[in-house]
A protein has these predicted regions:
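Class I (Rossmann-like) S-adenosyl-L-methionine-dependent methyltransferase catalytic domain
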Residues: 1-59, 87, 97-156
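A conserved beta-strand element that flanks and buttresses the S-adenosyl-L-methionine
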Residues: 68
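Hydrophobic adenine-recognition pocket in adenosine-nucleotide-binding enzymes
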Residues: 72
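A short, conserved alpha-helix within the catalytic core of class I
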Residues: 75-87
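Helix-to-beta-strand junctions that scaffold the AdoMet/dcAdoMet cofactor pocket
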Residues: 76-77, 92-94
């Protein structure tokens, strides 16, 4: 299954670079805390985060070598999504690796999540954003189980 492969890839890349500072955007319950060195998790709604703040309001002094956004940049208009991507890129050092999982606009399986509207991600949008933001695309693929879009960027 692709998600397991993606998580293994992320874990291996971060284990191979233990000195990297890593940002987990929308970390939720912060499940990677203690598993990834030098990890900072931000989330506007979950107290398990290191810092409870929306992405666009996060302005740290340091920059990051790796970034995770595994389902957190999924809500709002095209302009909001692009602004969040642009801000995420600005938080990274040159050569940083950015791992994303995006919902292509599909509803969640759980009834309590039916009210959530997801941005309709597709590969063309990812490519266009990468071009506009000046990042390299290292990988892009779709999960065959839940149709999530996975992509990896590298900053220049």
């Amino acid at each position: 299954m692709l998600i397991r492969t993606s998580i293994k890839t992320i874990n291996q890349k971060l284990k191979d670079n233990p000195s990297w500072n890593t940002l987990d955007i929308g970390c939720g319950y912060h499940e990677f805390k203690g598993k990834i060195n030098n990890l900072i998790g931000i989330d506007p709604y979950n107290d398990a985060a290191d810092i409870c703040v929306p992405l666009l309001d996060y302005h740290p002094e340091e920059r990051y070598d790796a970034m995770l956004a595994l389902g957190s940049i999924n809500f709002g208009s095209t302009d909001k999504i692009f602004a969040e991507l642009e801000h995420a890129v600005s938080l990274c050092n040159p050569g940083a690796v950015m791992f994303f999982r995006a919902n292509p606009g599909l509803p969640h399986d759980k009834d309590e999540s039916n009210w959530i509207s997801f941005y309709p991600w597709d590969a063309n949008f990812v490519v266009n954003c990468a071009d506009q933001l000046g990042v390299d695309i290292l990988d892009i693929r779709t999960d065959s189980h839940k149709n999530r879009l996975y992509f990896v960027w590298r900053t220049k």
